[in-house]
A protein has these predicted regions:
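Residues that scaffold the ATP/ADP-binding catalytic core of kinase and kinase-like folds
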Residues: 14, 66, 90, 183, ...
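Conserved beta-alpha-beta core of the PfkB/ribokinase-like small-molecule kinase fold
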Residues: 115, 120-200, 217-219
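Structural alpha-helical scaffold elements that stabilize or flank donor/cofactor-binding regions
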Residues: 108-109, 165-166, 203
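Conserved phosphate-binding/catalytic region of the ribokinase-like
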Residues: 2, 191-232
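Short, conserved phosphate/pyrophosphate- and ester-handling motifs at nucleotide-, phospho-/glycolipid
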Residues: 32, 176, 213
Length: 232
């Protein structure tokens, strides 16, 4: 019961210089595997060339997958650069990772999962949202279980309900300073400093840990009663 899962979007980032595999959950699972842990990617791809190529790349990297092929196109993100070189992202909707099914195999995986990392982006659709929430609810209860919510606020693909339900189910929250400002506005406490907001979230959702990244200004790790800081 030591499997570590990255659950959510698996897609192609289509860049000006070509395409590369993207998706935070897949990236998480890959890096975990490089430390020798039993990791899995849970997602969905289409029955198309893009989907098969994702499966082939993961196989080449020896990354274990539980990826369903569904009757929707494989997800893509069109990445363009504006006049000053700032990237702009167009995340396609109605794609495979919006339709991750909850299967018997996925239920068995949930029962043997020690840690899972999930985000808000893959919950923009009702199908994948229900699957992710059901997976989290199926995992065994226990102090050793780790449920990491890596908030990923993109293109307005989130609601207060999605954020509340995700934070209620997680025990570790990873968030950046810009996302924290957005979350604070949604929940109605914008007038206090970033650290105070973190303490509020830690207590409100009974979190084991909250990780706040602040770009070039370093990172903070909050646990009940203790905060640590690391330079970038």
């Amino acid at each position: 019961m030591n499997t570590i899962v990255g659950m959510g979007e698996a897609l192609w980032d289509v860049l000006p210089e070509g395409k590369k595999i993207g998706g935070a959950p897949a990236n998480f699972a890959y890096h975990v595997s490089q430390f020798g842990f039993d990791s899995r990617v849970v997602s969905a791809v289409g029955r198309d060339a893009d989907g098969q190529e994702i499966l082939d790349v993961f196989a080449q990297k020896k990354l274990t997958c539980q990826i369903e092929q569904v009757d929707y196109p494989t997800g893509t993100v069109q990445v363009t650069l504006d006049a000053v070189g700032v990237p702009c992202y167009e995340i396609k909707e109605g794609v495979a990772w919006d339709n991750i099914p909850f299967t018997d195999d996925l239920k068995r995986l949930a029962l043997s999962t020690r840690a899972v990392c999930f985000g808000s982006l893959a919950q923009r659709s009702p199908v994948s949202r229900a699957t992710i929430q059901r997976f989290l609810d199926t995992m065994p209860d226990g102090e050793d279980q780790i449920k990491i919510f890596d908030i990923n606020l993109r293109q307005g693909f989130y609601t207060k309900e999605i954020l509340c339900e995700s934070m209620r189910r997680c025990n570790i929250l990873k968030i950046n300073d810009e996302e924290l400002v957005t979350i604070s506005r949604i929940f109605g406490y914008p007038g206090i400093d970033l650290q105070d907001k973190c303490w509020i979230l830690l207590a409100k959702y009974n979190l084991k840990m909250l990780i706040l990244t602040c770009g070039t200004n370093g990172s903070y790790v909050f646990t009940p009663g203790v905060v640590s800081y690391q330079d970038t």
